[in-house]
Amino acid sequence: MDYSRLLKRSVSAALTAAALLCSTAAFAGEVTIWCWDPNFNVAIMKEAAERYTAKHPDTTFNIVDFAKADVEQKLQTGLASGMTDTLPDIVLIEDYGAQKYLQSFPGSFAALTDKIDFSGFAKYKVDLMTLEGQVYGVPFDSGVTGLYYRTDYLEQAGFKPEDMQNLTWDRFIEIGKEVKAKTGHEMMALDANDGGLIRIMMQSGGQWYFNEDGSLNITGNAALKAALETQARIVNERVAKPTSGSNDGIRALTSGDVASVLRGVWITGTVKSQPDQAGKWALTAIPKLNIEGATAASNLGGSSWYVLEASAEKDEAIDFLNEIYAKDLDFYQKILTERGAVGSLLAARTGEAYQKPDDFFGGQTVWQNFADWLVQVPAVNYGIFTNELDTAVTANFPALVKGTPVDEVLKAIEDQAAGQIQ
């Protein structure tokens, strides 16, 4: 008998068994997750958890549904106090706030650069969660934007779907004036106290409130300047119906008061909430600014998942996110069909769900349109003070509407912002 060979086989078998035992033990914990919105983020995370536990039955999940503000407050408090045992293993963070957490609390989130293949995700999503060469989040839903419009109103005003292709903002305003004159409907709703439209236009021009080094990018920001001027024209030329707050804007949309809405893909469910409007809507790319480098793609909103560095289940949490959010293409088909969630994993765009015509939109493949625009969204530096800049912009915008030169308004925005963020 060859005892040497037998010994080698025995050792090999023992090592294999030990490896399997360690692997099994590594995935037998409870992963706690904080997020908001029971009908969207929470429901989607529950679906992801079910898929993972089907292959890893020893793993359990505790998915906690908080209001968005409560998630942010509890996360801020836990990180600031150093009481990491009060924090979850995974937390959902809105993309606009990602850098604020990463820069304010260095070392608090797990670096995932070597754990997940980020080349498969939309670049603009990866960039916003990257700090000093390390990627700290797993991209989730996109806020890629589109222009939804009422085909019946446009037809009454003498416009065809081809007139809504390759729009500029100048042309959009011209069409809006015709629609108002001939149908009595404003082209869109606009809450001048909300910075959303300004941000959409600014990012479509490839710029943000901040430079790459985090310094303010206001007075020399061509995209912001053009966005402010464009929104002022929309107000002064009465193309928009004035609204106050998101609920008021939704009422203007669903009641049929306005002819279009320009928002992130997440508004699709609201647009489709009125069955009697089926077949009366269409989708097109957003208008372009008249500046060098402008695109017809942008983003509004969106969130991503982050693993806490101090998590006792860190490796398990990372493996879960990698297996489901970075690899499971069928998962993305299901959450698109059931929740209207357009994910950031590019490979998922070729699935059947994305290519299905939607009768509500006259048979358009709306999800495929959003998937195509997703890769065109310019990557920008959201910085850590987007909310403060929004406040400065909306506070100074009325002066522009009343005739103050745009360069003076930009200087006032910069001065106010500089005081707020010091």
Swiss-Prot record:
InterPro entries: Bact_solute-bd_prot1 (IPR050490), SBP (IPR006059). One of its GO terms (cellular component) is periplasmic space. The keyword Signal applies. Pfam families: SBP_bac_8 (PF13416). Residues 1-28 form the signal peptide. The keyword Cell inner membrane does not apply. Residues 246-277 are annotated as: Lactose-binding. Keywords: Periplasm, Signal, Sugar transport, Transport. It is found in: Periplasm. Induction: By lactose and various galactosides, and subject to catabolite repression by glucose, galactose and succinate. In strain AR50 the expression of the lac operon is constitutive. Part of the binding-protein-dependent transport system for lactose. Belongs to the bacterial solute-binding protein 1 family. This is Lactose-binding protein. It comes from Rhizobium radiobacter (Agrobacterium tumefaciens). The gene is lacE.
